[in-house]
């Protein structure tokens, strides 16, 4: 098992963890309906980039 030779200082520990934060999901707004959805995914109404691509139960 590996054992560190010297204790890592709080500053170095913070630098090591600096990229471990969570980011929010990239969201997009559908231009035709105004709904918010994940980028590169269809909206709940079945629209993608302003065009109807999937029939939904409401159609």
Swiss-Prot record:
Region described as Disordered: 1-59
Keywords carried by this UniProt record: Ribonucleoprotein, Ribosomal protein
Alphabetical GO biological process terms: translation
Ribonucleoprotein as UniProt keyword: yes
Alphabetized GO MF terms: structural constituent of ribosome
GO cellular component terms, A-Z: large ribosomal subunit
Entry annotated with the keyword Lipid metabolism: no
Record's compositionally biased regions (Basic residues): 49-59
NCBIfam families named among the record's database cross-references: rpmF_bact (TIGR01031)
Record-stated family: Belongs to the bacterial ribosomal protein bL32 family.
Name used for this protein in its record: Large ribosomal subunit protein bL32
Lineage summary: Bacteria, Pseudomonadati, Pseudomonadota, Betaproteobacteria, Burkholderiales
